């Protein structure tokens, strides 16, 4: 029987496909090693279909995840490590944190020497001094009283992606000639910190090379955005960054107390232990006020000899503060200097609606889209829970599905539960409040990565209130 023209063409295609076919050994290798990115052909109901390779493998979460869990009914500040124990030693998510110089378009100019940054130009002429982190996956889950935090390099089911982002290595200053928020080591007048007090330049209380303060959250946001006109990628410190840094610390050190004594030794199992130390939190209020009126005093980049590392470095206060030469320890977490203490940090992407009255609520709204950050309403924000109405040491946090670190209940202590203090007050009428994190140089044990204050409107300024610089390439 003669074939039709269409049938002949199909036969030719079959012969051509057979002739051009390759053996399995002749196929090129895949470009990655993540099984969640690969597809394979399967036969189902007599038909060929595609399937994610990961769904076909006995690929266990326990193999590629590490994290912590805690029983929120237990007062201990220590948490339990879970997941792959080898990952708790190698810390693959944490080791993605590294110092770099970032230009105003968000391009990495260079990565800094992981052991010591002091050999690099950090004065702003080659870019902002930032710490890169992200590009991993996380999951926050609750089962009865158990709260879990999980990290992975793989997109496991139920995990959400943490995009690449950048946070300033230092508490931010302002380039005075351009009103650009900056992360630099620069002692010229153009980067004078504090409230730009030129008459202090030759005094021991100089703010040259120090962080900028006496700025509202509103203006911190504006100054950050000045780095690139028309873009919302440059920001002051954001809640998402603060929150993730807190959980990175907790998973690494298996404690909720960031002020645990610093310890260079590993545990017998090879894990990190201890914390970041007191930080710059042990000044006397009256002496600090007399010395410089609560303005910052630690120079930006003071701990840069530690590179991408974690540690602390002693700083001696001027004798004008105290004739006894008071000493404080400046802490550093994976390249981030003074992650708490010294000065409070204004944080964007979080607004709290505090209602008056004993039966009112303090409603917490968060936003991961910088284009929607604002200080006047909650449009584009999500309600994630309610803040504690009283001040005190934090006993419980909101947590939820995104690991919220806003206090939900007080009643803890300086060495129990979260070990950090919660500050707030109840207004006479409904008010929108911003959130400050970290505490400052006189807070002592009250300070820390989870220390939070919702006492002020975003327009508030003070000598001891600063922020950091962030670059968010994409929304979370």
Residue ranges and their predicted role:
Residues 1-32, 475-476:
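Short, intrinsically disordered N-terminal pre-domain segments
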Residues 30, 60-132, 138-140:
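GGW-centered surface loops in extracellular recognition modules
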Residues 32-44, 335-337:
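Short hydrophobic/aromatic-rich beta-strand motifs
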Residues 41-59:
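Short, surface-exposed terminal/edge motifs of secreted or surface/virion proteins that either
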Residues 44-47, 136-138, 172-173, 350-351, ...:
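Acidic glycine-/aspartate-rich tracts in secreted/extracellular proteins
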Residues 120, 124-127, 151-339:
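Short aromatic-cysteine micro-motif
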Residues 241-243, 265-299, 323, 339-352, ...:
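C-terminal, surface-exposed recognition/capping segments
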Residues 353-368:
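A short, polar/charged loop-to-alpha-helix boundary motif
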């Amino acid at each position: 029987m003669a074939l039709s023209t269409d049938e002949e063409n199909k036969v030719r295609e079959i012969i051509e496909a057979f002739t051009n076919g390759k053996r399995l050994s002749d196929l090129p290798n895949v470009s990655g090693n993540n099984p969640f990115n690969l597809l394979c052909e399967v036969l189902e109901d007599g038909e060929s279909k595609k399937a994610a390779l990961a769904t076909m493998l006995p690929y266990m979460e326990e193999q590629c995840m590490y994290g912590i869990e805690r029983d929120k009914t237990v007062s201990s500040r220590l948490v339990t490590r879970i997941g792959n124990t080898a990952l708790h030693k190698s810390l693959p998510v944490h080791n993605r944190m590294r110092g770099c110089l970032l230009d105003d378009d968000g391009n990495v100019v260079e990565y800094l020497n992981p052991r010591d940054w002091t050999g690099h130009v950090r004065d702003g002429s080659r870019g902002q001094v930032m710490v890169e982190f992200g590009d991993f996956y996380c999951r926050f889950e609750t089962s009865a009283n158990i709260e879990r935090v999980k990290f992975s390099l793989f997109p496991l089911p139920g995990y959400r992606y943490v995009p690449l982002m950048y946070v300033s290595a230092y508490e931010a200053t302002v380039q005075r000639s351009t009103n650009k928020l900056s992360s630099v080591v620069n002692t010229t007048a153009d980067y004078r910190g504090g409230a730009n007090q030129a008459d202090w330049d030759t005094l021991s209380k100089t703010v040259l090379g120090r962080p900028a303060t006496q700025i509202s959250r509103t203006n911190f946001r504006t100054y950050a955005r000045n780095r690139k006109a028309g873009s919302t990628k440059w920001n002051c410190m954001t809640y998402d960054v603060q929150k993730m840094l807190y959980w990175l610390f907790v998973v690494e050190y298996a404690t909720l107390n960031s002020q645990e004594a610093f310890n260079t030794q590993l545990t017998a199992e090879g894990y990190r232990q201890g914390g970041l130390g007191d930080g710059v939190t042990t000044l006397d209020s009256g002496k600090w006020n007399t010395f410089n009126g609560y303005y910052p005093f630690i120079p930006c980049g003071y701990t840069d000899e530690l590179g991408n590392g974690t540690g602390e470095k002693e700083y001696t206060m001027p004798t004008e503060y105290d004739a006894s030469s008071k000493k404080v320890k400046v802490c550093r977490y994976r390249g981030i200097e003074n992650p708490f203490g010294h000065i409070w940090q204004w944080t964007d992407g979080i607004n709290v609606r505090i209602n008056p009255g004993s039966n009112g609520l303090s409603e917490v709204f968060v936003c991961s889209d910088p284009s929607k950050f604002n200080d006047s309403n909650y449009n584009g924000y999500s309600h994630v829970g309610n803040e504690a109405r009283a001040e005190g040491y934090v006993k419980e946090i909101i947590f939820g599905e995104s690991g919220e670190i806003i206090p939900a209940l007080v009643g803890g202590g300086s060495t129990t539960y979260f070990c950090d203090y919660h500050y707030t007050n109840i207004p006479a009428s409904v008010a929108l409040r911003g959130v400050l994190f970290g505490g400052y140089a006189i807070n002592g044990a009250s300070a820390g990565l989870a220390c939070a204050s919702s006492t002020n409107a975003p327009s508030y300024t003070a000598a001891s209130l600063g922020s950091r610089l962030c670059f968010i390439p994409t929304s979370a």
